[in-house]
């Protein structure tokens, strides 16, 4: 996919994180020292790892259908953008590149995929990315995810306690 975006500071900020994550995922060599924002990179890396761990079977099915990754990226980002979609796209493309890069030069392929993701995001959602303060927005996503997971855990625990008390009450009624 030829780049349709102007290659300004915003472009290179977006590309930096995406490209370094994909290279690290494929080589297993740390790339944190090469990124602009190491804290956001850690969040991105952990989130992508989680997405790949839980979705690798689905990713394999998509890859087996021989659908061009550009089409997949475009479809995922077609109607709206959020950090979850960006993370999923980056995770999928990293996984995809590791699976199919045997046919081409690794550095060449990582660059193509990274640029395609960056182009797809910025061609339609450049102002959103800037409004998110670039990669700083992913930190807020992490905090909301943590709050949601904590709330879910608390609700589950409260439900378990209430159910246990109800069972105890019913059992004590029959004794």
Swiss-Prot record:
GO terms for cellular component: host cell mitochondrion. Pfam families: Bcl-2. A motif (BH2) lies at residues 105-120. It is found in: Host mitochondrion. Keywords: Apoptosis, Host mitochondrion, Host-virus interaction, Inhibition of host apoptosis by viral BCL2-like protein, Modulation of host cell apoptosis by virus. SUPFAM superfamilies: Bcl-2 inhibitors of programmed cell death. One of its GO terms (biological process) is symbiont-mediated suppression of host apoptosis. Its main location: host cell. The keyword Transmembrane does not apply. A motif (BH1) lies at residues 75-94. Plays a role in the inhibition of host apoptosis by sequestering and inactivating multiple proapoptotic BCL-2 proteins, including BAK1 and BAX. Belongs to the Bcl-2 family. Interacts with host BAX; this interaction inhibits BAX oligomerization and subsequent activation. Interacts with host BAK1. This is Apoptosis regulator Bcl-2 homolog. It comes from Fowlpox virus (strain NVSL) (FPV). The lineage of its organism: Viruses, Varidnaviria, Bamfordvirae, Nucleocytoviricota, Pokkesviricetes.
């Amino acid at each position: 996919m030829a780049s349709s975006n102007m290659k300004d500071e915003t472009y290179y900020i977006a590309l930096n994180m995406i490209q370094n994550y994909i290279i690290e995922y494929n080589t297993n060599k740390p790339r944190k020292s090469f990124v602009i924002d190491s804290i956001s990179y850690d969040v991105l890396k952990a989130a992508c790892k989680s997405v790949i761990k839980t979705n690798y079977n689905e990713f394999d099915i998509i890859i087996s259908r021989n659908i061009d990754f550009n089409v997949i990226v475009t479809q995922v980002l077609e109607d709206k953008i959020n950090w979850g979609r960006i993370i999923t796209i980056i995770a999928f493309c990293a996984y995809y590149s590791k699976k199919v890069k045997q046919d081409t030069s690794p550095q060449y392929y990582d660059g193509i995929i990274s640029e395609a993701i960056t182009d797809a995001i910025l061609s339609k959602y450049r102002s959103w990315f800037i409004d998110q303060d670039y990669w700083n927005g992913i930190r807020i996503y992490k905090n909301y995810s943590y709050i949601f997971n904590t709330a879910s855990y608390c609700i589950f625990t409260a439900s378990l306690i209430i159910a246990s008390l109800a069972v105890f009450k019913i059992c004590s009624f029959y004794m």
